[in-house]
């Protein structure tokens, strides 16, 4: 069993926010691979399914913590304990302001870089889980970071975000087989990041 978790906030108010990029990717994986119905457990919405990989068919648990973004570790750690898993069995998808819109990077270990969801995960699980960082760009002003990530994706964002979610689904077997580099390369090949300034989306406003 491997866990794929998204970071985000529960409720319709936040559903299309940049901060909910992780939830949106998990939803797309759920639909693309025909996972089972969502149910409530571990203070989260969870769904089980399988994905065919080079190493054989892999059981996967999808998790969307309902604890709000800054407490996601509390929910995921409950699932890890229940299934007797290790932090290395966990992959978390989350938005990343320090990456340009449309960029994706895989990270294992290291610091939380100010991401409170990652901070919560590390507090509960340590540093040895995998993070899939989805670039949403920086607004250019520290005071605007929260309004930026708690705003909905704009139309210009969807031009790269939707292809990226599709690419993540197609490349997912590489990730589940432990080939982080191949997964990252394949996603960026299938959905190249737009060639614009990292702050462009924020400047465009509601474009």
Swiss-Prot record:
Chief location bin: cytoplasm
Q: Give the matching CDD domains.
A: PTH
Q: Which UniProt keywords apply?
A: Cytoplasm, Hydrolase, RNA-binding, tRNA-binding
Q: What Gene Ontology cellular-component terms does the record carry?
A: cytoplasm
Q: Report the domain of life of the source organism.
A: Bacteria
Enumerate the catalysed reactions.
an N-acyl-L-alpha-aminoacyl-tRNA + H2O = an N-acyl-L-amino acid + a tRNA + H(+)
Q: Where is the active site?
A: 19
Q: Which family does it belong to?
A: Belongs to the PTH family.
The molecule here is called Peptidyl-tRNA hydrolase
Report which gene this protein is encoded by. pth
């Amino acid at each position: 069993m491997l866990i794929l978790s998204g970071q985000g906030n529960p409720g319709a108010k936040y559903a299309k926010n940049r901060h909910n990029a992780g939830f949106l990717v998990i939803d797309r994986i759920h639909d693309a691979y025909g996972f089972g119905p969502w149910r409530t457990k571990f203070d989260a919405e969870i769904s089980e399914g399988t994905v065919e990989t080079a190493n054989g068919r892999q059981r996967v648990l999808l998790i969307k913590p309902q604890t709000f973004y800054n407490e996601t570790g509390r929910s995921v750690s409950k699932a890890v304990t229940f299934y007797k898993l290790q932090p290395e069995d966990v992959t978390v998808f989350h938005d990343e302001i320090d990456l340009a819109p449309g960029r994706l990077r895989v990270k294992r270990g290291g610091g939380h870089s100010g991401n409170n969801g990652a901070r919560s995960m590390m507090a509960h699980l340590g540093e040895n889980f995998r993070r899939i960082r989805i670039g949403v760009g920086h607004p250019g002003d520290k005071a605007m970071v929260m309004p930026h990530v708690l705003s909905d994706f704009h139309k210009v964002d969807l031009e790269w975000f939707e292809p990226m979610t599709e690419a993540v689904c197609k490349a997912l077997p590489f990730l589940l087989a432990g080939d982080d580099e191949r997964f990252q390369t394949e996603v960026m090949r299938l959905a190249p990041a737009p060639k614009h300034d990292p702050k462009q989306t924020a400047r465009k406003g509601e474009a």
